Amino acid sequence: MSDIALHEEAVASTLAGRPHARASARRERPVQVVWCDDVRRGDVAQPNAPKLGVADTLAHAQSTAERNRIVTSLLHLTGFSTFAYFALEFTHERVESLYLHEAFTPSTYRGDYVRHNHHDVDPRTLGARVCNMPIVWDLQQLRRDHQPRDDDASDAPAALDGFLQTMQDDGMCSGIMYSMAVPGTRLHAFMSFTAPRRTREWITPATVEQALSIGLSVHKFASPQLIATSRERAVNGLTPFEQELLIGIAEGASDKEIGRRLDTSAHNVDYHLRKLRKRFGVANRIQLTYLTSKLELI
């Protein structure tokens, strides 16, 4: 535990205050909640993925309920009470969507994470994204490491307090979280383990290894469904005009050339491309072409 704790202390200064900064901006639109199921499994092949026994067991399970039972039985052997597998979709560091999987969402989930914008102040998700090791946490440590500054006049401190209180009320007082980027998407998948124990001292390196084994197995099974769902939503969200724009830049056409094809001005082409860059969270047309090709939108 000591080595893990030292790592947590080393990154605490990097994370301090940043959840407050994320929460300070008012939201123009609510975060969308996207549910994934088993229907899309296998749409996206992962030929280089490691062979994990638990992942194969999940793949051969006959139902969502059976998959949930498999993970729950493994969870109890490790000392944790809940496991959640979810993904956040980011655009310029702003959370746009929360992806949940039917088989790996705790039965206690009731929508507060989105309803109360907890995703904006949850220091665990930020920590998991910037750290190359699992985050081992307890509520006391989260509260201590993210105390608001004396000159902080925003509503972020109250939002963080509300999140931590909800965690405590739900018996989620300590745990482990880690994250993996989902290739070809703007998603980051998170594996979250929680327990009612008040401090993180009970979590040993062996416990972390067990959590990694379970979470990576779930990720191997479920990430293709995240990718397929993300692609489907991206395609469905494009108008025919936007698809033609993307085809044009993929072919190397200039704004003027694309405008001639679509019977519109180069200025209008530039305007819509800027909107697409903002939507997909990229800085230029090269990155836009790369991402839309990876997503198989064109």
Segments and roles (model prediction):
Residues I4-A10, V34-G42, G53-L58, T72-P183:
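Regulatory input/activation interfaces that engage signals or partners
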Residues M180-A195:
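Sensory-domain boundary capping and coupling elements
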Residues A195-V208:
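Regulatory loop-to-helix N-cap segments in sensory/regulatory domains
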Residues Q210-L226:
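Signal-transmission/dimerization alpha-helices at domain junctions
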Residues P224-F241:
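Regulatory hinge/linker segments at domain boundaries
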Residues F241-L245, D255:
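The N-cap/first-turn positions of alpha helices
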Residues S254-Q287:
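Recognition helix of helix-turn-helix DNA-binding domains
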Residues R285-E296:
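Short, basic, alpha-helical segments at the C-terminal edge of helix-turn-helix-like DNA-binding modules
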